[in-house]
Amino acid sequence: MRVGVERAVQGLALAGGLILLALVGMTVLSSLGALGLKGAQAGWLPQSLAIGPYKAGYEIVELALPGIIFAMIPLVQLRHAHARVELLRGRGAPTLDVVWQIVAAAMFALIAWRIGLGMAGKMRSGTETFLLALPVWWGYSACLPGAWGAAIVAAYNAVRLARA
């Protein structure tokens, strides 16, 4: 089971990383386009380089970035790589770790549930971004796999630690 969970969360994190790379590439190209436009307007670059920035590229970044972050959380949760404060370490530490994993599972499930409700509300209202008219619910939907994945991984960790 561990291998299946590991592969699933690695795949989700890899997808998030690839989308992040695409956003970085888009931002770099948009910046180069803006530089070309300003350079052509100033007269120190040819007009053929005056392509300008992408129209509202920040809206794409704004919709995609939360989903990218949520795509990484299940892998971080599986590997216990969150920032930690070592309190109450000692004989009761394994039990405390199980309790914290249960708390994390409940917290991520609550977050995923609320994201789902928010997405449903945005779908009903038809809210779109201002310039590109992209449906806002797309950003919410990008967060759901990672949020539910983190809840499932935390519950899996709790069971695994309880059995150890």
Which functions belong to the PLM regions below?
Residues 1-164:
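Alpha-helical transmembrane segments and membrane-interface helix-loop junctions
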